């Protein structure tokens, strides 16, 4: 049975795949990206080739190369590198899973196939089981994101008896707003040491109350430090301060969501905040507009998110 070297917990950055202006992967900045996450954001776990990383817009060869680069550059700097290996093809998922094991990744994650969909728990489990078996020494995580996959099988149902079918199962990335489903996942698996990683950044504090052990998200690339401060306040049981941090983070997310927010805009914000060029997204996504970037920068400044200083009381309490 596969056990992680230590339980995956805390913040996990869903990494962006940097690209050049002509749409090729820019491997040259990944080392700098690792250092930025660790030193500036205090984030030492990553989730590679997921939604934020445009994993399903990359070729299998590219996904392998990206995974290798993150593992190599993260050696002795990152705590855990989780590789998303989900694909529409079982064979491709198995190939990516085996490759992740070969390069020394710390775990693999898989979404449900979303074109020819599994409509029952048993069918989905059978698919996941075959992928997990391709990397029997690696911890396996299910990536639950029904809004994108269209697979509406509840995570609570999926987890019931899952270790009997997938002995390497170690947890899930829960990217849905259904806190009833999430809460029941936690409540019904208290005897297990599963990692319950919440994937809706703007609702993280609610998930922590429900028992989340960590979080995977795109905003932890550039708001990791602020979110870590929220986690620290929560651990100290300073719930008022934790709530203020969450509200402040929500102000920014609410602002950009109203402008139109996705992978393209995440790349633009990360470039702005980190100073590392993330480049454009790959088609069919379009590059974020200059108007969006300018508006996002102004909002970040108004919330003091570009200074990397502690939030002031006035900044916490005032709706900017």
Swiss-Prot record:
Membership in a protein family: Belongs to the DapA family. NanA subfamily.
UniProt-annotated location(s): Cytoplasm
Lineage, highest ranks first: Eukaryota, Metazoa, Chordata, Craniata, Vertebrata
Record keyword Cytoplasm present: yes
GO molecular function, one term: N-acetylneuraminate lyase activity
GO cellular component: cytoplasm
Name of the coding gene: NPL
Alphabetically ordered keywords of this record: Carbohydrate metabolism, Cytoplasm, Lyase, Schiff base
EC number of the protein: 4.1.3.3
Active site: 143 (proton donor), 173 (schiff-base intermediate with substrate)
CDD domains, per database record: NAL (cd00954)
GO BP: any one term: carbohydrate metabolic process
Its biological purpose: Catalyzes the cleavage of N-acetylneuraminic acid (sialic acid) to form pyruvate and N-acetylmannosamine via a Schiff base intermediate. It prevents sialic acids from being recycled and returning to the cell surface. Involved in the N-glycolylneuraminic acid (Neu5Gc) degradation pathway.
Oligomeric and partner information: Homotetramer.
Protein name per the record: N-acetylneuraminate lyase
Enzyme kind, highest EC tier: lyase
Binding positions for aceneuramate per the UniProt entry: 51-52, 175, 199, 201-202, 218
Recorded catalytic activity of this chain's protein: aceneuramate = aldehydo-N-acetyl-D-mannosamine + pyruvate
Pathway per the UniProt entry: Amino-sugar metabolism; N-acetylneuraminate degradation
């Amino acid at each position: 049975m596969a056990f992680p070297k230590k339980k995956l917990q805390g913040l996990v950055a869903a990494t962006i795949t940097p690209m050049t202006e002509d749409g090729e992967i820019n491997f040259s900045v990944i080392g700098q990206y690792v250092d930025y996450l660790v030193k500036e954001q205090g984030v030492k776990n990553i989730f590679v080739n997921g939604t934020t990383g445009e994993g399903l817009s990359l070729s299998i060869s590219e996904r392998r190369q990206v995974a290798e680069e993150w593992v190599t550059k993260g050696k002795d700097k990152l705590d855990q590198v989780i590789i998303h290996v989900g694909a529409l093809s079982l064979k491709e998922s198995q190939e990516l899973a085996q490759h992740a094991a070969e390069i020394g990744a710390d775990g693999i994650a898989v979404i449900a196939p979303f074109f020819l969909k599994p409509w029952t728990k048993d069918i989905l489990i059978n698919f996941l089981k075959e992928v997990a078996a391709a990397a029997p020494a690696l911890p396996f995580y299910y990536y639950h994101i029904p809004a994108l996959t269209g697979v509406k099988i509840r995570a609570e149902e999926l987890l019931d008896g899952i270790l009997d079918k997938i002995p390497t199962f170690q947890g899930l990335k829960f990217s849905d707003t259904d806190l009833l489903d999430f809460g029941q996942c936690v409540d019904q698996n208290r005897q297990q040491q599963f990692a319950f990683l919440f994937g809706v950044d703007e609702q993280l504090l609610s998930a922590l109350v429900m028992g989340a052990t960590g979080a995977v998200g795109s905003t932890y690339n550039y708001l990791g430090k602020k979110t870590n401060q929220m986690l620290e306040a929560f651990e100290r049981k300073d719930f008022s301060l934790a709530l203020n941090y969450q509200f402040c983070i929500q102000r920014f997310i609410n602002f950009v969501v109203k402008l139109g927010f996705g992978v393209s805009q995440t790349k633009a914000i990360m470039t702005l905040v980190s100073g590392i060029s993330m480049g454009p997204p790959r088609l069919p996504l379009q590059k974020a507009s200059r108007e969006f970037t300018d508006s996002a920068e102004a909002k970040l400044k108004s919330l003091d998110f570009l200074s990397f200083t502690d939030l002031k009381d006035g900044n916490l309490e005032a709706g900017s």
